[in-house]
Amino acid sequence: KIFNKNETIGSMKIFGEKNFYLMNIWSSWCIPCREEHKFLVKLKDEKNLKIIGLNYKDKKENAKKFLKDFSNPYSLIFLDKSGTIAIEWGAYGVPETFLIHKKKIIKKFVGPLNQESLIEIQKIIK
């Protein structure tokens, strides 16, 4: 939906103080990313949660097709063609997801989100 070129996801300045943010590192070629995507779509309508995507080592065209085929839960998407931004966040692969509140990481999910992590996120943001 929105591929942001002007801001950097490397700093916390894009995250506001009020909402919770879910920063999801994903790729169109990642099979576990496809498996977790339905859980991101379920979280998309949570009032005080914004989902931000970091597209990892992917082609923009492939990422757009993935989102067209599977739906777009992201309010913002950043491109990380080289993978260096993900490394700066402490991610070692895809998918990885960070729950952020008041500009601090409060939970890190390594691997695909599932029903259990969906329930955990919903409890935290209520």
Annotate the PLM regions:
Residues 37, 41, 60-67, 118-122:
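Extracytoplasmic/secreted envelope proteins and their assembly/folding machinery
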Residues 22-23, 51, 97:
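Hydrophobic beta-strand anchors of alpha/beta hydrolase catalytic cores
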Residues 1-21:
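A short beta-strand-turn-helix
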Residues 68-73, 80-125:
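Thiol/disulfide oxidoreductase modules built on the thioredoxin-like
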Residues 19-21, 25-29, 93:
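Short pre-active-site segment immediately N-terminal to redox-active cysteine/selenocysteine motifs
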Residues 25-42:
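Conserved redox-active cysteine motifs that mediate thiol-disulfide chemistry
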Residues 31, 58-62, 84, 113-116:
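Short alpha-helical
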Residues 45-46, 50-82, 94:
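Conserved segment of the thioredoxin-like fold in thiol-based oxidoreductases
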